[in-house]
């Protein structure tokens, strides 16, 4: 598996397709949108895991206290349950480095505070 330093450049358009097919059933990205099964991801970058107001996180997510940035997301999205044992997220992860890079590029654009 490619490390973050070896990750390909991300394509936000391709990442949006990945988000719509693999993430949108549980997450929203728009400011003010409510939580679904997973938390709203607006303002994700620079936020500490387990801290979105109004969402009931697992103790594992709160205790991990990772700051979400590109490298952390790249590693997390490979295998969420390995990165944060005990997370409630049921998504198995994205094995392809390009898919992870694309999704991160999309999230960086779509979750930035406006």
Swiss-Prot record:
Q: Give a short account of its post-translational modification.
A: Binds 1 heme c group covalently per subunit.
A GO biological process this protein is involved in? gibberellic acid homeostasis
**Compartments, record wording:** Mitochondrion intermembrane space
Q: Where on the tree of life does the source sit, at the highest rank? A: Eukaryota
Positions of heme c binding? 23, 26-27, 89
Q: What is the annotated signal peptide range for this record?
A: none
GO CC, sorted alphabetically, is: cytosol; mitochondrial intermembrane space; mitochondrion; nucleus; plant-type vacuole
Q: Which Pfam families does this entry report, sorted A to Z?
A: Cytochrom_C
Keyword terms of this UniProt record: Acetylation, Electron transport, Heme, Iron, Metal-binding, Methylation, Mitochondrion, Respiratory chain, Transport
List of residues that carry N6,N6,N6-trimethyllysine? 81, 95
- In this chain, where does the modification N-acetylalanine occur? 2
GO MF annotation list: copper ion binding; electron transfer activity; heme binding
**Protein purpose:** Electron carrier protein. The oxidized form of the cytochrome c heme group can accept an electron from the heme group of the cytochrome c1 subunit of cytochrome reductase. Cytochrome c then transfers this electron to the cytochrome oxidase complex, the final protein carrier in the mitochondrial electron-transport chain.
Q: Which family does it belong to?
A: Belongs to the cytochrome c family.
Subunit text:
Interacts with CCMH (via N-terminus). Interacts with CCMFN2.
The protein in question is named Cytochrome c-1
